C-alpha cells in the first residue's frame, strides 16, 4: 500500500474497526490516545521500515487517554465519542432520512497542560 489510504478505507468498512492512517510516531500516539483506533494503516511511499516499526511500538505501548491524565475528563470525553461510533446504526440512519440522532453530551472545558 503506497499511502495507507486504500487499506484504511477497506478496513473501516468492517464492523468495529476504527482505522487510522499514520505517518509518524506522534500521529500514531494521538490516533490511539485520542481516537481509540484499533487498526493502523501506513503507506510504504511515506513510512520507511524502521519508522513503521517505531510507529507500531509506540501504538502498542499506548491506550485511549494515556499521556493525558492531567486533562480532566479527557478519557471520558473520547470514550463517549468511540461509544457513539460503536452504537451507530446505519440502517436506522438511512430510515431516518439520514438524520443523526444525538446520543449524548459531555461538557467541554479548555484544559492547559501544567508545566
Give the role of each language-model region.
Residues 25-115:
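C-terminal binding/interaction regions
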Residues 18-19, 39:
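Secondary-structure boundary/capping signal
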Residues 6-18:
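Short Gly/Thr/Asp-enriched flexible loops that form oxyanion-binding sites at enzyme active sites
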Residues 1-2, 43:
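Conserved residues at beta->alpha junctions
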Residues 3-6, 47:
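Gly/Ser/Thr-rich loops at beta-strand to alpha-helix junctions
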Residues 3, 20-24:
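Glycine/small-residue-rich loop that forms an oxyanion/phosphate-binding "nest" at active or ligand-binding sites
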Amino acid at each position: 500500500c503506497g499511502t495507507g489510504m486504500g487499506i484504511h478505507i477497506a478496513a473501516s468498512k468492517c464492523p468495529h474497526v476504527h482505522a487510522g492512517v499514520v505517518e509518524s510516531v506522534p500521529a500514531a500516539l494521538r490516533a490511539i490516545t485520542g481516537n481509540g483506533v484499533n487498526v493502523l494503516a501506513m503507506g510504504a511511499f511515506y513510512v520507511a521500515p524502521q519508522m513503521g516499526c517505531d510507529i507500531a511500538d509506540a501504538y502498542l505501548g499506548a491506550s485511549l487517554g494515556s499521556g493525558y491524565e492531567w486533562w480532566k475528563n479527557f478519557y471520558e470525553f473520547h470514550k463517549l465519542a468511540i461509544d457513539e461510533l460503536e452504537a451507530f446504526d446505519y440502517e436506522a440512519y438511512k430510515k431516518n432520512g439520514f438524520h443523526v440522532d444525538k446520543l449524548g453530551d459531555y461538557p467541554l472545558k479548555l484544559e492547559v497542560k501544567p508545566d
